[in-house]
């Protein structure tokens, strides 16, 4: 078992999954992974299924040279997006694995959130393609390692409201006017 880049803050309330040397493009997978970061597990799974069906797009923020525009990217406040189906399928498999790990550990699956997800480059695999005049060019692939951890979201407890209403903050100008008024009244 390898070391993860980031250990969860509360190991009892989280679960992990990883995949090594996956034959899927690093750049597409990196953009897809960043899109599902901090999403609830159910929403992330639904999003990736929608990407496979081209109902939602993945915004391309870093590796977007030559990437076309799509209207679905407006949701992410950008104009550049794609539907990397293979990356989405690989991430769905990892999420399914992490969900099974969470179920085994007795965590509440409906409250899980994608806390950490990281995509690293794996060693390139080399093939060859034949060119004109007897030349040979490389035909490389860019596999990747993916690791993710899901954490059970804690309930947010709101502070009890005090009896006194909070004082409204006044600007310097209004404070000055109030002081002048008080000086006149005295």
UniProtKB/Swiss-Prot annotation:
It comes from the Eukaryota. GO terms for molecular function: structural constituent of ribosome. InterPro entries: Ribosomal_uL22, Ribosomal_uL22_CS, Ribosomal_uL22_euk/arc, Ribosomal_uL22_sf. One of its GO terms (cellular component) is cytosolic large ribosomal subunit. Residues 159-186 are annotated as: Disordered. CDD domains: Ribosomal_L22. GO terms for biological process: cytoplasmic translation. Keywords: Ribonucleoprotein, Ribosomal protein. Residues 177-186 have a biased composition (Basic and acidic residues). Belongs to the universal ribosomal protein uL22 family. This is Large ribosomal subunit protein uL22. The lineage of its organism: Eukaryota, Metazoa, Ecdysozoa, Arthropoda, Hexapoda. The gene is RpL17.
């Amino acid at each position: 078992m390898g070391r993860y880049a980031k250990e969860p803050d509360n190991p009892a309330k989280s679960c992990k999954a990883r995949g090594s040397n996956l034959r899927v493009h690093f750049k597409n997978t990196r953009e897809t992974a960043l899109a599902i970061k901090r999403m609830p597990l159910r929403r992330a799974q639904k999003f990736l299924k929608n990407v496979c069906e081209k109902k939602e797009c993945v915004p391309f923020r870093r590796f977007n040279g030559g990437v076309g525009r799509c209207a679905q990217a407006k949701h992410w406040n950008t104009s550049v997006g794609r539907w990397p189906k293979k990356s989405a399928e690989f991430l769905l498999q990892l999420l399914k694995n992490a969900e099974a790990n969470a179920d085994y550990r007795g965590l509440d699956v409906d409250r899980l959130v994608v806390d950490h997800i990281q995509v690293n480059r794996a060693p390139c695999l080399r093939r060859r393609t034949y060119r004109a005049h007897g030349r040979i060019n490389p035909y490389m692939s860019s596999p990747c390692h993916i690791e993710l951890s899901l954490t059970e979201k804690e309930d947010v407890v709101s502070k009890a409201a005090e009896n006194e209403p909070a004082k409204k903050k006044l600007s310097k100008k209004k404070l000055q006017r109030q002081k002048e008024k008080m000086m006149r009244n005295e």
